[in-house]
Amino acid sequence: MQYICEKTKMSILVVGTVAFDAIETKHGKTDKIVGGAATYICHSASPFSKNIKLVSVVGDDFPKHEIIKLEKKGVDTLGLQIKKGEKTFFWSGKYHDDMNIRDTIETQLNVLERFVPHVPKSYRKSKFLMLGNLMPSVQQKVLDQMQERPELIILDTMNFWMDNFLENLLKSLKEVDILTINDEEARQLSGEDTLVKAAKKITKMGPKYLIIKKGEHGSMLFGEEKIFLTPAYPLERVIDPTAVSYTHLTLPTINWV
């Protein structure tokens, strides 16, 4: 296996939310912090590549210094749309003592409601494509704009899209290499009770590999009739689990080649 930390060659296109979060756990509460799938994917991938390209949208309320922070880590923000007079996507949630359980308090789509992704020409031959958790039609619009098929396409989704846009999601699944979802979503998408049966059915929908996220219990990788289990790193005190699944998207890319 070739190590792919060749920072000038490993081009990664990241598509997803750049957002604000307000989070409450038993350890404390925040009013508004920077969140979003694309934000954390970019930060977690930056030690391995200086050729990261971002496609997302924010309002003019998003702090400029956070964008500069990404750029200093090698993230190209040409594809980040900044909508004047509009507000950035906002999510608020509360985690239970069991942090696998959370309640959504408020969701403000704001700029995300009318987001039409534009992939700059310089992005369209990216070697790796990470499609964060977005409306399936938005993910498909990105796929349609690629000039060459990336070597690896990873897609993350959730039960809300399965409930409301299943047909669009199934279309996109035919074009991806890896799908990442949690165990509850795997059961819902497949209609199967056991994760092994669920994985077999889902990989027949298009993805060559399926990663099932299981929170504090780690994750499961299915593909090519094989199963690989990886544990979570044990921590004495977990402050905020929100971005864990986002950074998880980076791992398959780092280990792909």
Question: Where is each model-derived feature located?
Answer:
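Positively charged, low-complexity intrinsically disordered leader regions
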Residues: T8-E24
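Conserved small/polar residues in nucleotide/adenosyl-binding loops
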Residues: T247-T253
